[in-house]
Amino acid sequence: MRILLTNDDGVEAAGIEALVRVLSPRHTVVVAAPAFEQSGMSHAITVKRCIRLDRYRPLEENYGVTAYRIEGTPADCVKLYLEAISADIYPEYVISGINHGANLGTDVLYSGTANAAMEAYLHGITATAVSLDMKSEISYDTAATLLEENLTSLFYEEGKVNFYNVNFPRQFCEGGPQFVFTQLGRRDYINAFQKMEDEDGRECYFLGGEILDEGNSEATDIVAAERGYISVTPLQTDLTDYIYLEKLLR
């Protein structure tokens, strides 16, 4: 299968290298990933300046893949590759990740990882965003292997375009790794901004905070991850509130 890999942690990240290591022996792999970390970039794209890129030799020399290091956002990387670099030989499948840290619930709206996958989906290509809990006991290689083993049975369906958000937990539940289909939960934060001063004495704020997960049902990705399951959430790009729209049109 022709697979495009991207992420928001940057082309040098361990998570994307694990995917290359596991996938390249059996698939035709191309990497198009940011030159630098781009966490929290959501679906931002670069305008009013050139996007520079070069080849990333370490991945090419170690694994025999084609790899691009792109000075842009995660969405830039996918958009640029598909529209300008690919020579109309599109990948059959796009994987964004493996992200260092979970992308659960409403955090997907801010996630560069998830939105890079969404960019592929907008181009009519099945895409999966993959994340691993920051404190996970599970290795990137294990996550990549489980993904590859379930590629055609769980994620890729010929003739149909799907968009999934996948999260690996801190540790697997009793009985070993299990994939479960979920819906997005709601993730909030306590004291999200920390007030500070910069080197010039000016007031500034650092985004952080403690996670606050309340009121999420058993059907959500957040609860599934807490219980040690690998959550698989199908996503879409249509944000229309059809129930309310129907009322407005009456």
Protein language model features and the residues they cover:
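Glycine-rich phosphate/pyrophosphate-binding loops
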Residues: 121-143
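Short, glycine-rich nucleotide/cofactor-binding loops
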Residues: 5-12, 107-108
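Glycine/threonine-rich flexible loop motifs
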Residues: 102-111
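Short beta-strand segments
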Residues: 6, 32-34, 71, 96-99, ...
